[in-house]
Amino acid sequence: MYPGRNFPPRRQNRRENVNESIRVREVRAVFPDGTTEVMPTAAALRKAQELGLDLVLIAPTAVPPVAKAVDFGHYQYDLKKKQHDARKKQHVVQVKELKFRPNTDDHDYDFKKKHAIRFLQEGNRVKAVVQFRGREIAHADLGKKLLMRFAADLTAYGTVEGMPRLEGRNAHVLISPVKTLIKSEKPEKPEKPEKSEKTEKQGPSTPPAPSAS
């Protein structure tokens, strides 16, 4: 090793925890029938192979380490699926900022309110900010009233984290989502109505022609 150079620790290969690559002498072996036994690794491997399975070290830091007799291919698939499902369930909460002016018109207000509703339904927090310029800071109460109105319009979707605060030339308020309203799945498509009678599809029948007298 060259002096002054730091090398990252060697990554453990998953294959090192399978069959003959297991380096510990003794394991707590778990078998498909639910039985567990502390035994030499060689004996556990032999028993797993008799069952047509692999011996996989699933808890290398336990005392003694735990090894399980499984199909390694299926084990890897199940492990990746569990990791994928766990990542899907995780939601990183973000703070979405919406900026207003003290004289924000109704159209801009409604536009930003719709965005805030969507952000809250997605599980994110919303930070509404009123920015003051020049002498507008003398009317900071107008900005606070706007924020209170905004928070009141979102009570069905979020809860306010305290009263509006003035910091420098900005007033802001934080709104957290209501957990029961967080969208986790796509809405179901409405079912198509079934036609009750065949005649509705074919249209009205033609009346019979009058018979010749």
UniProtKB/Swiss-Prot annotation:
GO cellular component term of the entry, any: cytosol
Composition bias, Basic and acidic residues: 182-201
Domain of life where this protein originates: Bacteria
Major location (coarse): cytoplasm
GO aspect biological process, one term: ribosome disassembly
GO MF: ribosome binding; translation initiation factor activity
Statement: the UniProt record of this protein carries the keyword Protein biosynthesis: yes
Region listing for Disordered, in residue ranges: 178-213
Keywords: Cytoplasm, Initiation factor, Protein biosynthesis
Coiled-coil residue spans: none
Localization: Cytoplasm
Pfam families recorded: IF3_C, IF3_N
Family: Belongs to the IF-3 family.
UniProt function note: IF-3 binds to the 30S ribosomal subunit and shifts the equilibrium between 70S ribosomes and their 50S and 30S subunits in favor of the free subunits, thus enhancing the availability of 30S subunits on which protein synthesis initiation begins.
Subunit structure: Monomer.
Protein's name in the database: Translation initiation factor IF-3
Species this chain originates from: Solibacter usitatus (strain Ellin6076)
